[in-house]
Amino acid sequence: MIERGKFRSLTLINWNGFFARTFDLDELVTTLSGGNGAGKSTTMAAFVTALIPDLTLLHFRNTTEAGATSGSRDKGLHGKLKAGVCYSMLDTINSRHQRVVVGVRLQQVAGRDRKVDIKPFAIQGLPMSVQPTQLVTETLNERQARVLSLAELKDKLDEMEGVQFKQFNSITDYHSLMFDLGIIARRLRSASDRSKFYRLIEASLYGGISSAITRSLRDYLLPENSGVRKAFQDMEAALRENRLTLEAIRVTQSDRDLFKHLISEATDYVAADYMRHANERRVHLDQALAFRRELYTSRKQLAAEQYKHVDMARELGEHNGAEGSLEADYQAASDHLNLVQTALRQQEKIERYEADLEELQIRLEEQNEVVAEAAEMQDENEARAEAAELEVDELKSQLADYQQALDVQQTRAIQYNQAISALARAKELCHLPDLTPESAAEWLDTFQAKEQEATEKLLSLEQKMSVAQTAHSQFEQAYQLVAAINGPLARSEAWDVARELLRDGVNQRHLAEQVQPLRMRLSELEQRLREQQEAERLLAEFCKRQGKNFDIDELEALHQELEARIASLSDSVSSASEQRMALRQEQEQLQSRIQHLMRRAPVWLAAQNSLNQLSEQCGEEFTSSQEVTEYLQQLLEREREAIVERDEVGARKNAVDEEIERLSQPGGAEDQRLNALAERFGGVLLSEIYDDVSLEDAPYFSALYGPSRHAIVVPDLSQIAEQLEGLTDCPEDLYLIEGDPQSFDDSVFSVDELEKAVVVKIADRQWRYSRFPSLPIFGRAARENRIESLHAEREVLSERFATLSFDVQKTQRLHQAFSRFIGSHLSVAFEDDPEAEIRRLNGRRVELERALATHENDNQQQRLQFEQAKEGVSALNRLLPRLNLLADETLADRVDEIQERLDEAQEAARFVQQYGNQLAKLEPVVSVLQSDPEQFEQLKEDYAWSQQMQRDARQQAFALAEVVERRAHFSYSDSAEMLSGNSDLNEKLRQRLEQAEAERTRAREALRSHAAQLSQYSQVLASLKSSYDTKKELLNDLQRELQDIGVRADSGAEERARQRRDELHAQLSNNRSRRNQLEKALTFCEAEMENLTRKLRKLERDYHEMREQVVTAKAGWCAVMRMVKDNGVERRLHRRELAYLSADELRSMSDKALGALRLAVADNEHLRDVLRLSEDPKRPERKIQFFVAVYQHLRERIRQDIIRTDDPVEAIEQMEIELSRLTEELTSREQKLAISSRSVANIIRKTIQREQNRIRMLNQGLQSVSFGQVNSVRLNVNVRETHATLLDVLSEQQEQHQDLFNSNRLTFSEALAKLYQRLNPQIDMGQRTPQTIGEELLDYRNYLEMEVEVNRGSDGWLRAESGALSTGEAIGTGMSILVMVVQSWEDEARRLRGKDISPCRLLFLDEAARLDARSIATLFELCERLQMQLIIAAPENISPEKGTTYKLVRKVFQNTEHVHVVGLRGFAPQLPETLPGTQTEDTPSEAS
């Protein structure tokens, strides 16, 4: 036996008064005991919330505001929760022993509305050892715990192996899982199902007989018979569809001409607009493509112009930069020319001053010689004067001396004095204070040697003086020359410097002689260097223009290649015009041919459309006119054959219909008259007696009775003998058999059964042999089998007849279509396709246009290449003669070398030019420089000093000699005083003295006169020297200025500078000319770019507008095409012949059709509105909608589902052809589909009986239920009187109301509603339609009335009403009804759920104190018998003997409110055990 699922426990987390509380639920009754406010209702509210987490339903009424018109906003739930995360969880074990924890996470939402957020979830696979509180709480310490959020709970469960956590976004999914796992009894698919479930729980919770339940017990207990209703609805829909089809066929036939006109005009109206939009779209696409091509071309042109602009700007920048450098170079060259000219003028001044200096030098030298001669003469005069003075002085001395030596004594005295004087003089002269006469001899030798040395030195100096005196003037002149050339120098270095200068002068003269050749060579090399630089520039420019770097070795080959290319390009360019002319001529011919084909295309397309229609209709492909005529002959023959076969099939079909009608007679009577005769004779047809014979026995009995199988069995033949007289309305052979119809058997014949046959012995002399018929029709099974086969044959025959009729008509239409085609289109239909030719020619035209564009582009490129090649050849022509220059890599080095040598030579030339004369003058007198010009004076001084030294030495030697000679005189000291005189000697001395004085006077006069002359000569010399120095200084300044100018002032410098300036001027002019050209070209390019930019902007704007228009049109067109394809009207609208009409012609065609359509749809409101909407030119899809609406209208009118073509015109023609056949077929189908009213009544009666039996079975479970005075409870089900009458009429008196059920205008439901109104005219139906009422009457539940009855005391069975029962009795009665509902739900849901699951049963009861102990015991017994769990709440004065009781006490401790819970299991003498699971974190359990 399958165990029923149970609720194990209820867990409340963070509810008001319950932080973490788990209530273990008893298998039967769990009692919550406590005073007011203890938390009983909160606990039950938590259970209900976890069971039905729907905020639209939850409403705990004990919090309802008193006197308010509506309940509290939070419906009593918000106030039962604490802030933060709250949980309510149910721990269950289902029939499969699976533990499932379901629950909800609740959280208060801040705000005035006091809302609560609810999230349902489920946990599967949880081990039994894990308590629910352990899942959702986290212990922080011994006294604190934290509630986990839903995400944290999910993460925690994900870590547990085998545990599945599911969170639900919808209550339906939550309840679906609970139903599948056996937690709830019914699958709650919708909000109404949840509402029923909640109302049941609410009725259980608050007790009593719920009016919401009792008023709608039918919805709770009686299942909906949707299959029967759907069968009726399908039948009615089929009948309605048949009737509508028939009506539509008739209406379509009557509206045939209107529809043809409507189709034709609608097609013209929409197809013209459709093709106009297609043409415009193609034109717009072509325009957009043209715009895009032009845009791309303009972009390419703009890009080319931009590249050109960049190149020209870059070249202009280069030229601007080059112009600056050229201007600087030109200015530098001009300045250089000016400097050269200035230098030349300076050079001329220098040369002029040098000539003046040379002249002054000559005069100065001459004056120097004059001054030197005068000086020499002055020296001689001074010597003569000095000699005269000395002679006078000597004579005076001698005269004095000789005057003293008058006698010997005087002489000796004089000699002694002289000796003393001589000794003193010797001491003084010899600087020998210790000199004595005795040592004088020794000193005499010494001083004589010194005298000899001084004499030799003096002689040497005299020799030098003689030489120096001769070269004195030359030395000064040479020294001045060396100083002039070399600059200031030491006089001692003059000789060496002069020799170096002379040697250098030789080199300088040699170098100066090379100036002109070097200058010519440098000029030549500079010219070659400039040519080389020009060639390099040309090569770089050439490579730049060619876009490739070339080696020098490749230039000649490139030149030949470019010449060959020029030749080939010249030929190509010359032949391009002819080729372009040929292409344009072919293009014009193609255009003319295309125009001709476009005029012929519509006629050919019309012929092809007609030919394609013929091909589609006949399924043949025609390639020539002969095949068309041959096929027309075949059609005529086929038409004749089809007509013959159709007539044969029609005859066979009529025979089958007659046989079916005969076999369909009631009781198996093939003749309807037999039934009337059987009733008349009071008998029964033999076929009706054997109506139940099996299909296997049917052949035997058919053969057994033979022709008498249609006999009538009567009780007594004698009683009908009189009735046979005058009987005319009967078959030709009427068989009558006597027998009891209730116990008739086949013993009336003697029968021998053979193989597949019988022999019937009718009499002794009459036997009948009958074989078993292959198709027996005796008995209902045989007849039905035969009728079924006949029906199948009839279907085949009907289909075949319809096919043949259709084929005949189709053949006839084909014949007419072929005749029209031959008359109108045969001449052009088999010509070549002009559109294919047009496409080919257009492709060729596009190729020609592309070829022309390519040709123009190639021609332009060839011209550009030709020009580039010519420019390249021109550049190469300038480059090739200079290849040797380009290959000369040492030219610049040679120029630098020659420049250096020229600089040296020019420096030498300037040196020679400046100092050549000085060097020429210096060369013959250079030898005089061996003696320093300053040493002449030194030499004179040395000579004078040597002469003085020699004189001194001589005087010293003479003095010493005199001392030595006078050694004897020192002994004449006594004669010193003795004087004597010699008058003669004195007189001679006096005469010589006078002569000497006279000579001295003459010498002095000559000296004075010559000194004046020397002074005059010296003044002239000083003037010349001053003039020379001035000019020399000016010359030096000019030379310094020339050096400062820094240019070579040679003869060709000015010409070279002028040539360089002219070259730079030419380059600058060329550069400026090119720059002006580039500026003009750049301006033109910028203007062209601006024009292209404006054009590009306009093109982009036009292109974007056109593209936007194309895209918009494409979107609309896509919508149109999608609508066209979805509705299958593309073939009708895409008429290719209209593509060759202009937009005005198509618009005119559409307007004409529109005018005709307005008249055609004037009476049809829908089509008129759609047509009015379709007139919007901006919404072409509305025309398609109109066209679709027209065809939809036609389909609705002509029933497209039963014809064999999608062409409305053909459909109308086929409808006319097959109208009678379809009418007959649909009528018979309606008769087969139509269900009899008696069958409907039987179905409803059987359903009612089945449900009454089920309710009776449910009542058996409530027989022993008693509450107070209520001894028993039952559910009474009765059929309403009005509906019972309806059932009776439907089953027995339906013939009286055939006007309702046979009406083609009423469905069966409507006819049923009309019958109900006819039977019950007193009932007001309100605003409900007959269809709605009829559908309600087809639901058996509306036939039943259900009410709850109780057997109470002496009153017997009474209707259970709250007013007639006490509170406890009402509670018990309501609980019984709810148990019945739950059990009914389980029975109903058993087929939807697994057979191995028995769902949990649990109900609530609040305030159970109103029940007495007997009633509570009854509840316990009911729970035990029905395996139901019950949760009841009661104050402290109720103590059930069974189940589990929780004592709840709400306490406040330190401003914290909590509920103290103690769990007890039953009452017994021993101490009850404390229930597991009641220990919590906030409140300990207590046992009592």
UniProtKB/Swiss-Prot annotation:
InterPro entries: MukB, MukB/SMC, MukB_hinge, MukB_hinge_sf, MukB_N_dom, P-loop_NTPase. Residues 666-783 are annotated as: Flexible hinge. One of its GO terms (cellular component) is cytoplasm. Residues 1049-1074 are annotated as: Disordered. Keywords: ATP-binding, Cell cycle, Cell division, Chromosome partition, Coiled coil, Cytoplasm, DNA condensation, DNA-binding, Nucleotide-binding. This is Chromosome partition protein MukB. Homodimerization via its hinge domain. Binds to DNA via its C-terminal region. Interacts, and probably forms a ternary complex, with MukE and MukF via its C-terminal region. The complex formation is stimulated by calcium or magnesium. Interacts with tubulin-related protein FtsZ. Residues 1051-1065 have a biased composition (Basic and acidic residues). Plays a central role in chromosome condensation, segregation and cell cycle progression. Functions as a homodimer, which is essential for chromosome partition. Involved in negative DNA supercoiling in vivo, and by this means organize and compact chromosomes. May achieve or facilitate chromosome segregation by condensation DNA from both sides of a centrally located replisome during cell division. It comes from Salmonella agona (strain SL483). The gene is mukB. GO terms for molecular function: ATP binding; DNA binding. The hinge domain, which separates the large intramolecular coiled coil regions, allows the homodimerization, forming a V-shaped homodimer. Its main location: cytoplasm. One of its GO terms (biological process) is chromosome condensation. The keyword Secreted does not apply. Residues 326-418, 444-472, 509-602, 835-923, 977-1116, 1209-1265 form a coiled coil.
